[in-house]
């Protein structure tokens, strides 16, 4: 917990899935797992268990019942608040199904683009698909 001008700011989550919780404002700030308006970065979550940990982190954010949520990754005009958290959960669930339904990164990328045609960061989608499908190593 940090203190800033008599306000507590809690660092929540684990490892790379941390976010800041400001209890007095009921606000989640900079939650790495929360994205909106873009394809989620999947290169850091190559295994199903990794993606399930992200969903668990998102569910822990929802359990706080925040009034304000500022996504860590988003485009201008994209939904914020619980809409962004729910979007991220739905995207991860769709991605998991698409991973099982496709043979390679190209198929995975195309299927996700078909399901989410308006999202930005297609290059991130394509790179992550290569890592998830074992066609590329990511540090």
PLM regions and their residue ranges:
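Accessory terminal helices/loops
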Residues: 8, 63-68, 76-139
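Acidic, metal/ion-coordinating pockets
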Residues: 1-5, 21
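Soluble metallo-hydrolase cores and metallopeptidase-like ectodomains found primarily
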Residues: 4-13
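Metallo-beta-lactamase
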Residues: 12-90, 94
